[in-house]
Regions:
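Long terminal segments
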Residues: 1-19, 25-28, 35-36, 43-45, ...
């Protein structure tokens, strides 16, 4: 299990436990990672396909993000949005630390988390 925290306040925002991502404040499950797909937990609707280093809108088929080993890029413009490592996610333009990850995440879990954070 891992926690996503707001970097400046230290407040826990999400818990990531295997295939489930839960809102820490409400205790409600928000997303489920189903293989290479991210599913809205409440509705069961497929939201994103996260295969091959890309984040694609499941409904429209439109590519949204490119996720490499340390960066998140906007697919259309190619602009770097964020940088990350195993414990910190920061805004690329400002260098400001956005989120802290407490705990271990697999590659699939970190990709899913980045998709959820930066697509919306």
């Amino acid at each position: 299990m891992a926690y996503l925290k707001d970097y400046s306040s230290g407040r826990i925002l999400l818990t990531i436990d295997g295939e489930y991502i839960k809102d820490y404040q409400t205790g409600r499950y928000k997303y489920r990672i189903n293989g290479d797909k991210i599913v809205d937990y409440q509705t069961g609707r497929y939201l994103y396909d996260i295969s091959g280093g890309y984040v694609k809108d499941y409904q429209t088929g439109r590519y949204l993000l490119t996720i490499s080993s340390s960066q998140v890029k906007d697919y259309r413009s190619g602009l770097i949005i964020a940088q990350y490592d195993t414990s910190i996610i920061k805004d690329y333009r400002t260098g400001r630390m956005l989120y802290k990850i407490d705990g271990f995440l697999s590659g699939r879990e970190i990709t899913s988390l980045l998709a959820i954070l930066f697509v919306v």
